Structures are given as C-alpha cells and as structure tokens.
C-alpha cells in the first residue's frame, strides 16, 4: 500500500473509474472542461493521490476518453465491451467485468464516478478506512439532505402535486434527525462479497459522511457549470490530503 497507516496493512485496493463515451443528457460529459481540465481528470487525480489505493484503472469504450485518462496517468488495461456501454448496462455489471478481466488479488474495490469532481483523495481514503474499521462488506459516501422526505413528490397528469407517501414515524424521525443521501462520490466494497452478492448497498452498509460542498454529483448542464465555477480558481489545487 501507499500508506503507513497500520489499519491498511494486508489490504490491496483497486479504484475503478467508469466512463463510457455515450452520455445522453450531456453529450461528451466526461471530457467537458471543468476548472480548466477535463471533468474526468479531477477523479483520476484524486484517486492517484489517495494513500490507500494501490491501482487506478479506467473502464471505457471510448478512445478519446482513454487517451485523456492515460495522459493524466490512469491505467487503461482493457476496452469495455459495447454491451456494457449502453444506457441499460449497470455499474454492477461494469465492476464485475473489470474484476473478472483483471483477475488480480485485490480484496477491496472502490467505484469512483467521474461526475463527482469535488471529491478529494482524503474522501476516498476515509471511505476505505471506514469499511475496514467496521469490518463491513460495503461502505458508501453520503451527504446531508437539505429537504425533508415529504417535501418531495411527483406531478400528476392533472398538474397536481403528489407528495411521496411518508409515514408519520418517518416524518417525525426526519424532523428529529439528520437525513442523508447517497452522493455518488464513492462506493467501497470487498471484492469477494461483491462478486457473490452483486450489490453496492446491503443491509449492513457503512457510511462515510461528506459535506455538501464536496458532494456535487453532476447530472445536468447547470451542475456542470456549478462545478466549473467552483473549480476554475483551483486548477492547481492539490487533491492530496493535507
């Protein structure tokens, strides 16, 4: 391992960055310029700076993304098959393919989506350490939710607001306690358990709490703009832990 942290001794950690070429909502999203460099570069830099990660690989079907990733020092050991690069392909399938293709003895895996450019190396290390500390099979990055569950809902065909059906007990708990959501910044798992169960979240998933200011998950052009505004002054920001 790259760390002197005794809690990490005996563990080998693989970081997998998934980045297919076909993005419907934001075409070419992974290579869009954010803060002066391609969006995917922020995740690659953080992963390479993480002390707990032994190897960082990219899973992509796109030659342009591959070239950019390699220019930032990311390993691209294979080309992702087309059937795993569609809208229907799941992240679970992508990770299973990566693990089976590499066929190496990593006991912990980390899925790092390029859409979380504000995530730091310290966040990656924290998520992995939490999994090890709790002796859990899975750990996910989460962030506080600003709005209570019952404030969300659908708009019916007649234009009326149809709120989520939240029980009184859940509503009270939400008002008394903090509510959290998966922020997409990190999914950590023990590889053998993942191969067997094929899930990132099970009944005993641990959490690594991240603040709102590092939890942006880019899914729209507006969110891409927000990330660009935040990161533009930080083009030389060191993603390594302080």
Regions found by a protein language model. Name each.
Residues 93, 97, 117-204, 210:
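Conserved core of the sugar-phosphate nucleotidyltransferase
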Residues 53, 104-106, 135-136:
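Short, high-confidence coil segments that cap the C-terminus of an alpha-helix
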Residues 15, 58, 111, 138-141, ...:
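Structural beta-sheet core signal
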Residues 57, 63-110, 118-122, 126-129:
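Short phosphate-binding loop-to-helix
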Residues 5-8, 179-242:
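Conserved alpha/beta core of the MobA/IspD/sugar-nucleotide pyrophosphorylase nucleotidyltransferase superfamily
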Residues 12-59:
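N-terminal glycine-rich phosphate-binding loop and ensuing alpha1 helix
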Residues 52, 72-74, 157:
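Short, structured coil segments at secondary-structure junctions
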